[in-house]
Amino acid sequence: MNRFRTSWDRRKFLLAAGLASTVGSLRPGNVYGAYLANRHGESYRALGVRPLINAAGTYTTLTGSVMAPEVRDAMAEASRYFVPLIDLQLAVGERIAKMIGVEAAMVSCGAASSITLATAACITQGDPDKVRRIPDTTGMKNEVIMVKSHRMGFDHAARAAGGKIIEVETPEELEKAINEKTAMLFFVHVFEGRGKVNRNHFIAAGKRHNVPVFNDAAAELPPATSLSAIVGEGFDLVGFSGGKGMRGPQASGLLIGRKELIAAAHKNNNPHSDTIGRGMKVGKEEIMGLLKAVEIYHKRDHDHDQVQWRGFMERIAAMVSDVPSIDTEVYIPGPGGHPLPYLRVKWDERKVGLTYAECFKQLQDGEPRIDVNNKNTGLELASYNLFPGEERIVGMRMREILLAAAKRA
């Protein structure tokens, strides 16, 4: 884990960042009021749903990420016309594959959909009779091998296509588990390092036995290189979310890999009626929106993003630095984590008179609502979904909550 322990001359930092007057004199109500006046989300509030500042991450439960303006424009433009959907899917898949340097690609309605379609492709190999029959996979190759420590709720998406999960814990067990019923090896990228079986074991075993290997890389952007590098390692299919790091439509995903497997996935997908993917509809708006998102992401200045995100975390750390017993750490996770700056904030709960859970709840209950991660050993903040200026609101609100508790303690 690459860590930067925060060491601050608080006044000097706040002056340089333009925050000294904000922390020293402005009342929180004025700051929050100005924020809400500029970004209030009235259409949501009319429904009783409060928009939030997202310092937690690209979770689907918090609606992933906010689309780039160019993506919204592309979707609006797409909405004005009728097109043959199959032709559009094939054309956009071909364009994306060429852009990122992979054999083939297709737009799905999300990373979980990519899991289902990848599994269906590997089980059916595009055979029309099998396509119509699944999830009834009686008599077919239907076993999907996973590392036991990689099991998760999302493997339901493989089972939905009729896949039977076979668990292994060692390279030896992986080798023994592969047989004439094995349809796919299923690796979860974020769980690399869990257990004794790594990605190289999976890739090598798949090659030896001619079994397709799928990598669920839903949230593995950034880094941008993941778009081609994971397939380049030897995986036959890789699935990404379109509505997380790429800032594409929330109801979109990307499945990339071998040409014949992507073709088989298409046969299992919308708009074909008698398929497992018919209910996973991705419309022309999402397809064109994701194409634009990939174009933007491919050309983006990712180094600038990293500098900006680290600045967000450092500013929040500076703003809570005078809380008794506070300990802040800006860090980038190691293997298995997302390579972007996070902030961990810890304090002595007895000295401050406030538990992490209580602070977490007050952040959510306040106005504006702020979401962070409560890790029980401290609060963790993610930089990716913050807009410039929001870090000041987060820092002021955390400081307000913590100092108020410390005064009462």
What are these regions (language model features)?
Residues S25-N30:
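C-terminal segment of classical bacterial N-terminal signal peptides
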Residues L85-L90, A104-A105, G277-K281, R300-W309, ...:
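Flexible, glycine/charged-enriched surface loops at secondary-structure junctions
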Residues M1-A20:
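N-terminal secretory signal peptides and thylakoid transit peptides that target proteins
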Residues P51-T61, R72-S79, Y342:
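Generic N-terminal amphipathic, Lys/Arg-enriched alpha-helix
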Residues M319-I401:
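Conserved C-terminal alpha-helix-loop-beta "cap" of PLP-dependent enzymes
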Residues A68-A111, A121:
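Conserved N-terminal alpha-helix of the aminotransferase class I/II PLP-enzyme fold
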Residues V294-A318:
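Structural signature of PLP-dependent enzymes
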